[in-house]
Amino acid sequence: MRKTAVRAVALAAVCFLSVFGTCSYAKEATSEPIQIVVLGDSIAKGYCGANKPELYCYGQTVAEEIAQRAGKSYMYQNYANNGLATREFNEKVLKGQEVQDSLSGADVILITMGSNDLLNEFKKTAQEILNTDTKFKSADEALKEVTEHVKSNPLLVFRIIDALGNWDYQEFETQWIEAMDTISSCKKEEAQIVVTNIYNPVKQMELPGTMNQVVEDIIGNMNRILEKRSSEYGYQIADLANSQVTEHVQKDGLHPDQAGQDLIAEIVRAQITGYERNMPKSQVDGTAVKVEEIPEEKQSQIRPEKWGICLILAAVMLGGVRFLQKNRKENRHK
């Protein structure tokens, strides 16, 4: 009888530890982090000028918000690079194994591309029209040089407008298709992709003559390419072109300031679905934490539905111990 009781207690103890161990990490096992990957240029990176800390970019804000609303943790990876145009995007970023591995596990992919294609074309055109060997580092630098030359030769404006108007959109579309082919081949079928379209990066600059309208037309054509390919590749367009982002830019007149980044985050977030709980945001019991920042020490988080089993096993163990104690007392009196 005594051996049977001991075995019962031992068995109950093993079961208790097994269930308790499962309960302790149930939340972690059943709640995979949301994986967000950001690709693109300096806008997606959160550029804030040379030798200055980067802004809190829109991708980070979106990651935190959807994780919070879903009550999950998140893994956020940003592969954006300053000055990146679509050709370099394909050659220097998307061919990387690390990037492709990240895309294969991503739940949400955010992409901002295209502005540098336009700006690079503007710099190239300015260099050719001005017949200079100077390689402009920025569109702002090129614009200042153009403005200076136009003062003495107003006809230069028409040459620049003509050159920009004849830009080869086919090259941009070809590179964009290649990029989306790569991303589509890497991503999970259910992954969501949001692409920001292009806002006028020189709207706040005082362009000579009617050049600003030409730039607007070019941007419109580029955005139509992005829109045309959206159904084919299954991505959503976050419309920055018709937003107030250009009202929230840095001193360079191009890159968004923090308010601009926050506005982009709001527009992008509206295109992402499936991360809402059936409760108000204020009642969400999850905390958005980067996976790599989760403390190594595990905290016991027993799921409510497991408490009943744990209590029953505890009762069995306690009953077994009392039974043994009673038997010992009876044996002493004999």
Regions found by a protein language model. Give the residues of each.
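Short, solvent-exposed loop/turn and secondary-structure capping segments
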Residues: 47-51, 89-90, 121-124
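Sec-dependent N-terminal signal peptides of Gram-positive bacterial secreted proteins and lipoproteins
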Residues: 2-25, 305-325
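Serine-esterase "nucleophile elbow" of acetyl-processing enzymes
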Residues: 26-82, 98-102, 262
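Conserved catalytic region of serine esterases and O-acyltransferases that act on ester linkages
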Residues: 30, 196, 222, 228-243, ...
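Structural motif
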Residues: 83-95
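Alpha-helical cap/lid subdomain in secreted, periplasmic
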Residues: 97-254, 258, 262-273
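Surface-exposed patches in mature extracellular/periplasmic domains of secreted proteins
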Residues: 71-81, 193, 238-240, 279-280
